[in-house]
């Protein structure tokens, strides 16, 4: 009977350890995913900002060409 208790305790302990490791890996992968999404969002906002400046640049160039 004592052997069964020890075996059961060992199985439960190893199960908890593996569950803890899996949860930690899952948490890390979610953090990496969130960081990746934030980086993508930042890149898109920079692209939009630059695209918004194109009409201004075109109008400035045309104004300069009219002067010269």
Curated annotation (Swiss-Prot):
Claim: RNA-binding is one of the keywords in the record: no
Main subcellular localisation: secreted
GO CC term (a single one): extracellular region
Tissue: Expressed by the skin glands.
Superkingdom, natural source: Eukaryota
Biased composition (Acidic residues): 31-41
Compartments where located: Secreted
Signal peptide per UniProt: 1-22
Miscellaneous section: The primary structure of this peptide is identical to that of Phylloseptin-L1 (AC P0DQK9) and of medusin-AS (AC L0P329).
Protein name per UniProt: Medusin-AS
Organism: Agalychnis spurrelli (Gliding leaf frog)
């Amino acid at each position: 009977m004592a052997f069964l208790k020890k075996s059961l305790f060992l199985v439960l302990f190893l199960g908890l350890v593996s569950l803890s490791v899996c949860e930690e890996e899952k948490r890390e992968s979610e953090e990496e995913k969130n960081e990746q999404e934030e980086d993508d969002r930042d890149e898109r906002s920079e692209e939009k900002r630059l695209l918004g400046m194109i009409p201004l640049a075109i109008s400035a160039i045309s104004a300069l060409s009219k002067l010269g």
